[in-house]
Design a protein with these regions (language model features):
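N-terminal transmembrane-helix/juxtamembrane module of multi-pass inner/ER membrane proteins
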Residues: 1-47, 82-112, 222-240
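Hydrophobic alpha-helical transmembrane segments
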Residues: 36-55, 123-130
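Membrane-embedded catalytic cores of phosphoryl/pyrophosphoryl-handling enzymes
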Residues: 107-232
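N-terminal signal-anchor transmembrane alpha helix
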Residues: 1-4, 69-89, 210-220
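Membrane-interface alpha-helices at helix entry/exit sites of multi-pass transporters
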Residues: 30-33, 63, 142-146
Length: 240
């Protein structure tokens, strides 16, 4: 038996085991659906922590701000990489699409993600880019961020069958690796230094841009995706 087949067996066993708690307690189902559908409990706490660290006075504040800027840039890059992998790698059906697993879905949950490839989890990618970046600045805040990313962003997606465990582990590993790779890049000081100087010389422009990026991160760039999809469809129809 190959390693991949072993992994597939454990993927299925773990997602079935995690899913068995669905429809046991109505209040728990509502809580899980809220975590999956609402933007507030997922990425907003991580973004608030980033904002707090940005403005909190600290002897090493410039270095902290460099790390936060790296987190912003790597978040955008990481989501691009995750979507590229999902499109380029062989399509992987989400667990909820495997009817033989007999997974139970909360009644109020939208299953419109069936047509999206399951591997890797872009939610896990973004969550762990931010969490590991926060860990680089503050170990206590980083530990909380890693717990939040695991318990409130990744685990609910496993429970309802949006992802297999390997999807989430791959996404988390990719996000963590990119966050740890950022300080090794030779161009990091040039880029973050330019942005920090621009923040001083053009604060209105930079903070407006920062707010836009943070807002889009909080909603997983859903607005940008919708606009891009409409533009793509319009361009394709015009080109015949």
């Amino acid at each position: 038996m190959t390693l991949l087949s072993d992994l597939g067996i454990w993927d299925e066993r773990l997602v079935v085991w995690a899913n068995h708690i669905v429809e046991r307690w109505p209040g728990f189902d509502l809580f899980i659906v809220w975590l999956l559908k609402a933007h507030l409990p997922r990425f907003v706490p991580l973004i608030l922590a980033m904002c707090w660290l940005w403005f909190k006075p600290h002897p090493n504040q410039p270095a902290r701000r460099e790390v936060l800027l790296e987190a912003l840039l790597m978040s955008v890059f990481a989501l691009f990489v995750a979507r590229a992998l999902a499109l380029l790698l062989p399509f992987r059906e989400r667990p909820l699409g495997h009817l033989e697993l007999g997974l139970t879905m909360p009644a109020s949950l939208d299953t419109g993600l069936r047509t999206w490839s399951s591997f890797p989890s872009d939610h896990a990618v973004l969550a762990f880019v931010l969490a590991v970046s926060l860990w680089r600045i503050s170990r206590p805040i980083g530990a909380w961020a890693l717990f939040h990313a695991t318990a409130f962003i990744c685990l609910p997606r496993l429970i309802v069958g949006f992802h297999f465990p390997s999807d989430l582990i791959a996404g988390a590993s990719l996000g963590a690796a990119l966050a740890l790779l950022a300080p090794m890049l030779q161009t990091r000081h040039a880029i973050t230094g330019f942005l920090l100087r621009a923040e001083v010389s053009r604060p209105a422009t930079m903070y407006s841009l920062g707010f836009f990026i943070l807002f889009e991160m909080a909603e997983m760039f859903d607005s940008v995706r919708v606009v891009a999809a409409h533009v793509f469809k319009a361009a394709r129809s015009m080109l015949g």
